[in-house]
Structure formats: structure tokens, C-alpha cells
Amino acid sequence: MIVPRYYEDLSVLHENTMPARAYYIPASKRMDNLVEHREESDRMQLLNGTWKFQYFNSIYDVQDPFFEKDYDTENFDEIQVPSVWQMAGYDTHQYTNIRYPFPFDPPYVPQDIPCGAYAHTFVYHKDENAPKAFLNFEGVDSCFYVWINGSYVGYSQVSHMTSEFDITDLLQDGENSIAVLVMKWCDGSYLEDQDKFRMSGIFRDVYILKRPEQAISDYHIKTKIEDMLAKIELDVKFYSPANVKISIEDKNGAVVAVGSIAEEGTAVLEIANPELWNTENLYLYQLILETENEVIVDHIALRKIEIKDQVIYLNGQKIKFRGVNRHDSDPVTGFTISVEQITTDLTLMKQHNFNAIRSSHYPNAPFFYEMCDKYGFMVIDEADIEAHGPFMLYREEDTDYNRFKRWNEKIADDPAWEAAIVDRVKLMVERDKNRFCIVMWSMGNESAYGCNFEKALAWTKKFDPDRITQYESARYRNYDETYDYSNLDVYSRMYPALSEIQEYLDKDGSKPFLLVEYCHSMGNGPGDFEDYFQMIQDNDKMCGGFVWEWCDHAIAHGTAENGKKIYAYGGDHGEEIHDGNFCMDGLVYPDRTVHTGLLEYKNVYRPARVVSYDKESGELVLHNYMDFDDLKDYVKISYKLTQDGLVISKGKLSEVSVAPHSEGKISLNINVPENGKCYLKLIYQLKKEMPLLEKDHILGFDEIEVSQKDAKCQLAEKWLEKTSADSELQVNENDTQIHIKGREFAYTIDRRTALFTEMKFAGREYLNHPMELNIWRAPTDNDMYIKSEWRKAHYDKAYTRAYTTEVVQGKHGVKITSHASVVAETVQKILDLTITWTIDAAGKIDADIEATKDGEFPDLPRFGVRMFLDKKLADVRYFGMGPQESYRDKHQAASHGLYRANIGDLHEDYIRPQENGSHYDCEYVELNNSRYGIVASAEKAFSFNASYYTQEELEKKTHNYELTESDSVVFCVDYELNGIGSNSCGPVVLDQYRFNDVLFRFQFTLVPYVKG
């Protein structure tokens, strides 16, 4: 074999790598802008670019010494470094969540392990002031061997961590060659079973650092803040001792502290009356470390994170993590993420009120943390560890209890893995120890618990006692043994029900409760942000949470003929082991287009909320949910008063001082009309420009109904009014049909269904297909589990049948009453119905449907009528919650208004099609064109959905670009829909959002019309 089999040897994790150290970029002179422009340093030589590359299906196919200096690579392909080779057309894509993509046989991997051979030439000029050269790889998946000028340099693994080699003696002045052999898998892959597409290659930057002989090798910044004095301790290590001048400058460039050190040890500097860093005030000091031939510029954020009485404090202030889990993921570049891509993510996060990020489930590129310091995010830094696969091993006793009980046997509690697990934690902590945005170290994710994590936690706490530790998998254990949790500072949980959280707070509560993952944001959802928000705010021991997750993971495959982007997920590349679209679970689409779920999050976590408003006295009580800023310093507030969706007055509130986590009062007097649906909307805007945020950026809003006694939408009332038309209707009946004809209309009702089959008005047919009673919806991703119950109940096959029908004709119209039911093959009646249609002389249709559900059946997906309307009715006008989709448990980002849209604009284009685009709490909706239309209106608010796609089409197709439009506008007028929730990987829909009514009554009005 061309290389030693270190990739299957737990005793060899690295060979010839330098000791782990803090990340920094040196230069020959002071350079202050290295966070996002580090390549400008004259002591950093990037080796990124076009490299030669050859992919091998098996390590045994690598026969030639491609790493030799003069090896002819003419037959090699070319590849960009950094990149992943799957995105360059090699190998195949595979998405898997828990299951390993290879046999569980540690430390061994498949014998014919795929690999990639890289070769590159570069020019290197030696610098007499910086003669030492250190080769850095910031990310290589999974392990690699490296050569310089044909000489073997070393070996390393841990995909998402930096590996550094001293190559001083191997370089020559002028042209040099570098060769790298990257293995697709190694023994470390058993610890890299993260929920993501599996990708391979040199995916982060490769560079050489030029260093003086006498230079700093490592430094550790420690801060103590007491009584308006900041003490900065700088532990310094050297390659060879050097005189170091130390200075600290404030943001204006004024020197506030100086010191020096000349040998390994600790320098202590002090800053009086320091400015403290937090996520709302991003104050950074500049640290300058200067030796004779080198300057290192870093920054310091002075802050103190601590736990007192089970409550987390930052700088003495109680805080809440408004967090999100973020993977490195891009549909085109895969794991390879640039500064610009990170800036896009951080900007969107700031715009949507996040203040914290969990680096799930591995450390990010080092500049990511510098950017979080700069832009104001608290970070949970997570070790590159996930060993979820042992949970899925074959067990004779195949129960969840037994799986959880034995999960830790093979890795977490097997001492053979101690060195590998502790190594990964040490590498993370050592590299990122000087990044003050990091307030919490995480030992990894979903790997069970055991002796190896006890050791990792003990080392971490000893090395860095000032940060918090967390590891959610500590709750998984061998139930026959007792493990040491003393070095864990928080109790972390994923996707607990609210009742489970309350139980912990009531019975134990010995540590702060952290929602390390919650509100699984897959497809249409989540539907429970507001409920978790209330739980988090109601108890100080609840320190907040991190939503799962930031972005949909997908692979871009160009554009379909219909112009839609083609995004692929698990199973789309022919792989046998995959987890489908479970990777499509983000708050943004793969290209960072915003999901409606992100809008929902933003407004739930707005900086302020109305506690109460007395419209008589004008007293408005506000709560400030900021952790540090007084409301007057952060937010300016404007208001709009609307009547039936139209703005009738607006203005700005005077400045109001409200301390963080406190309430304050202000006066707002408005004149509310005597009639109509009236809402007062308060808009919170950013008062000042901030990094990544523009002044006047909208941070959220509150909406308060302020209607008087006649609180009815006048638009709806207009269509509900009795008409003055007074003409005799013609009613003709036969065994199957009832024909009703008036001066301008001709309707037909099918006696067998009690529903309309024809609806002609002014000579124009409105219905392309018969009306239906509808209890089904295209399952959302969050219907993942309940949909099996729904199908078992045959809800997806249900239809309406009528038994008896009575026709009563009067002077001003006709009333048709049917006893009917909703039925499906093999099961009993689902619903008993009394359906009454009252049609007046002008053609207005009043519906009254009384329903009784058989209590044996599960919650209904929905209940309403579905019409297939003339496709020319393409314009929509409605009074309800918009402009984006809204549901009974997902409408915090929507507000009441009079909205206009095109049918196509109402569709939310989820990559896996599903129920979408409904609008909640509506009283009136109108579909029309320039000549004619139809209105649905009701006294009691309803939901509606107008789409070019049937629910059958949404359910049948697996990708949005495959969707085919119907020949109709599919118009659903719904009494109710079941809640959205987050049950794709979370608790069931909360009781208050379930559609579990046994008795209900749906009354609404339909009015076809012609304009003019």
C-alpha cells in the first residue's frame, strides 16, 4: 500500500503535526483588518487555487508515487482548492442522518476506500526575517497524508479542525510541490456521523505562515472583571523566546494598557472603567503583540459569563439565548464556505433577531468566530464529534429503551476511544480559546455518554473554568451505571414538550435548562415558536434555545424547464442509505431565500412587546425584552391604526425609557371608529445603524385589536347582507340533481353529495369540477407521524354522500337541506352532516354545515369546501392575516389587513411540496379578474387557500420543480385546519392547536358577481 494504514489505527490520530494552538495571523507589520481580509498579511501565503486531482475508487488503485516532486500529473484532472470533490463531479452525493454509510466495524472502514490525490506547485520565497514555515490545513474530510517536494510531511484527521506542520526544512526558494492524499473515510469517521450530506476533500483554506525563529507560538487571553477593573492575563508560549511588547487599544485607537514579556509565562495588564462586550454593544479592544520581526493583532471582548442560582448571566445581567443551529452548507459549494457566505448568514440572523449560534456539530472555520466577536453573537462551540450510528445497530431487543441504554457501549463508554474524543475537544478549545463570543463549550452531539466524555469534560473545565460546558447526550446512559455529570454546567435537551420542561423546572431545576435544539424548522413550520418563547420568558432558569436549524441542505442541479431551481436531497443521487428530505429543515432555503418560519421567529423574538393598552385612557405598557439596552437607545416606535385593513391614522411614539427585562408606560391616544375591524399596529425599528443592520430596520411589530362594539369587517358585512332582488326562482329536480335558476344564474346541486356541480353566473361557469367537502391536506413535513394515523383513518380517501334532501322554495329564494356524511372505504362514517344551502334571487349562496365527528377518529387535518374555479380568476383580495401564509399556531409574523395578491404569489414553494399558503382569521376573500369574480365571506373568521396546485399534486410530487398546475384555481374555504407544530422532530401539536372538535358548525357565504 502506498501509505501506512493510519486511517484505521486509533493509536495514530496525527503524525508530525504541531501542538494545538490559538488561531492568529501574523504579519511583518501592524495590520488591523485581518478578520475578513487575512490574506492581505505578507506572512500568510495562501495555496488555494487550481490543483491537479485524481479520484480513485479504491486506495488499492493508487499505485504510482504521485507525491514525488517531478511526477507527471498531465493525466490528472483539475480541481479547486478549497472544495469538496462531490461538488466537482466525483464520487456521489449521500445524505444520511444517523446511519453510517459503511459497516459498523471500528476502527475499520471499507477496504476499497475511495480517495483523492492532490498535487500542486507553488513559488515560495524565503524571508530572512521569517525563515520558519508552517503549513496549515483548516479543514480536510476525512483524513490526509501530505508531502512537500516528494518528502513525507505527516498525517492528520479531525475534518473540521486545523492541522499544522513545520515544513521549514522541506521548502526551497522558488518552485515547490505539495501533494496530498485524502481518504473518504477513516476511523475518525465513526466520530463524524453528523446529520448532513457526506462530502470529502480539502474543503477549507490551505496556507503557509512565515514566522521568525524567535516568535510567539501560542497565547491564551484570560480576563477577570471586578469592580470596574478589567484584568487581562496573557499566557504566552514561544518557539524560541522573544521580547514582546504588548499594548491594548480602545476602539478609538487610544492605548489603555501596556506590558511586556520575554519568556514563557504570564503578562498581566489592567484596564480601568472598561467597556464591556455584549450582543447589543459590540465593543472590542485591540491587542497588539509586537516582536522584533513580527506583529500579531488580535481583539479582546471584555465580558463575564457565569451561572448564579441556576441562572446564566453575562456581565451581571440575566440573558436569554435567541439562538440557531448552523451547519456549513451551500447548494453549490457544499462544506466550503467563504467569508462572504458567512457574512450573508450573519446578516440574515441579525435582521431576524438572533443573538446566538451553535456551531452544529463541529467547529467552524476560525474566522467565523472572529466575525461573531465583531458582529455580536454568542456562540456554543461544538467539538467535531457525533457518534449517532451505534444507536442504530441491530439489536435482538429492538426497543427505544434498549437502544438508548446500550448506545454508549461501542464508543462513548469504550476506553479505546478516549484519546480520539479528548483530542477533538482539545483541538477545538485550544484553537478557539481567545474568541470571547464563545460562551459555551459543547463536547459534541448525539454520541451517548460515558467515560470518554467524562474525561473530555474534566480536561475542559480544568483548562477553561470560566466558560460554560454543555453536552446534550449526557442524558443518554447505561441505566445500570452512574456517571459523573459534575463538569456539565447546563441541562440540555432536544425537542422536549413544554410539559417535560415544566416537570424539570418543578422537580429538579439544579442547572439552567438549555433548549440546544427546538422547533424543528422542516417545511411548513414551525408552529410553536410563541409557546416556547413564553416558557423561556416565564422562568429565569430557562436560558433560551437554539432553533433547528438555519438552512435547508441541498445539492443544486441547475434549472428546470419551468425556470425553477432544481434542488436534490437524500435519495436523489441513487444512494441506497439515505434519509430523504430530512435535511430540508432550515429557516432559509438553500440559496438563503427566507422561509416563512424565519419571519415567524423574527416577530416572536421582537425586542419589545405590548403588555397592555387602554384605549380609553391611552395608557400603553411595554416590556423590553432586550438583555442590555434601554428601549430608548435601541428602538423607535411608530404606529398605524387600521379600519377593515385600511390605514386611517399613523404616527410616531415619543421616546420611552424602559430598562432591559422591565416594563414602562407611555401615552398613545387614538380615535377609534364606531364600526369595523380596527387594529393598532406598533412597529419597532432600529434607532441607530449597527454592524450588519441599517438604521430604521424593522425589528418586529405588535398588533392589538381596538374595535368598538360593532367589531365587524364592513367588507364582509356588505356581502353578507340580504339582497333586495325579488324574483321567482325556477327549481327543477330529478333523482340525482337539483337545478336552481334565477335571472342571472343557474346552479346545480348533486343529490348524491349535497354539493354544487355547476355554478353559472351571467352565462359564465365558475366551477371546472364539482365542489367537494374537504378534510384532507397535502401532509406537511411536520405531519410526519400524524399522517399515518390520518391515512389509517382513510381521511385521504374520504368523500361525501347524501342520504335525504329537502327543498323548500320561498318568495325570496330556496333552501336545500341534506342529511349527509363523510365516508371512506373500510371505515365507519367519519362525520355526520347537515348541509343547508340557501340561495336568494340574486344568486347569493349561504352555507350552513353542521358536523358531528365519530370520536374514534383522530384529529382532522382540516374541514371546509374545495372548489375548482375558472383559472382566469387570478387576482385575490382578502381581509385576514397576511401577507405570508398563516395558520392557527403559525401567524405571529402575519397581521390583519386588506391584502391583494396574484394566485401564484400565495404559493410558498417548499422544495418538497406540501400544504402551504393558507391564510388564517379571514372574514372576506375575493377572487376576480377585470370582469367578474366570486366572494367568500363569513361572520366567524375562517381560513382560505387559493392555489394553482391541487393537494393531490402537492402530495404526489417529491420536488417543487416537478409540480404541474391544475386546470383550475383550487379554492379552499376552511372552517379550521389542524395546527402545524414541529413534530417532524419534536413534540406533537399542542392541544390548543389541534382540530379535535367533535361538534362544529361552519357558516359562510359565496357570491359570484359581474363587475359593472
What label would you give each PLM region?
Residues 2-26, 31-38, 153-154, 177-210, ...:
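Glycine/proline-rich low-complexity spacer/linker segments in large multi-domain proteins
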Residues 87-89, 184, 278, 669-676, ...:
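Beta-strand/loop-rich accessory regions of lumenal/periplasmic or secreted enzymes
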